[in-house]
Amino acid sequence: PMTVKGVSGVYFAVWAPEAMRVSVVGDFNLWDGRRSQMRRLGDSGVFEIFIPELKKGAVYKYEIKFKNGDPALKADPYANYAELRPNTASIVWDLDEYKWNDQDWMKKRAALDTKTAPMSIYEVHLGSWMRKPTEVDKRGREIVGSEFYNYREIAVKLAEYVKEMGYTHVELLPVMEHPLDASWGYQVIGYYAPTSRYGTPEDFMYFVDYLHQAGIGVILDWVPAHFPKDAHGLA
């Protein structure tokens, strides 16, 4: 989201060098690719558009028309938020609303000599590390179900465990948006969107913020080489 000449709205840009036409489509224009056609920036392969009055929470995709005439609907590879699977659209979001509280951690990190300071890293996949109990057996024991904890809920549980075990950092298996649970995040669709399986971008910010306040560093796995073949993705 941004403001141009006093008008609030959303600026979109995407690189699609082989496209004949690119449009932004969503509920706001009845998913009609003829309405919000993007402007090509010279020979750069980049298409752009500013859509006035569009607000946070708007669901959208890019409609791309190729040289063979066939259109394709693609999620925004630069989006910060996506619909919860099995839905595949991107969501307009504003990342500036969260108020961070980890100033003490950031000062400590800046003063730390990372080459010599001790480090003990706990690698974890959030979706399989712990899930919500959904049933109780005849002995009164909780049976783990398939529902994930959200980022805020698991932050509390993970921080407590990691501190008790003496780790200094957690390393998260990929939390970027991905279509398939079983891939553990290693088939990425949205590199700039924390997966909506566990909540909103603000929820993820809270997760990092909470661990920082508990004195725990957060490392993210980065997977730039695995592209799923889902129709709404890059490949």
Predicted regions and their residues:
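Short proline/glycine-enriched turn/loop motifs at strand-loop junctions of beta-rich domains
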Residues: 15-22, 55
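The feature marks proteins involved in alpha-glucan
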Residues: 1-11, 41-123, 128-142, 146-148, ...
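Glycine-rich, histidine-containing beta strand-loop boundary motifs that form or position
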Residues: 14, 26, 51, 64, ...
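Substrate-binding/active-site clefts of carbohydrate-active enzymes
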Residues: 103-116, 125-235
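Short beta-strand elements bearing conserved aromatic residues within extracellular beta-rich modules
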Residues: 22-24, 60
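Solvent-exposed serine/threonine-rich low-complexity stretches and specific carbohydrate-binding patches
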Residues: 34-42
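Beta-strand-enriched, solvent-exposed domains that form extended recognition/catalytic surfaces
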Residues: 16, 31-33, 49
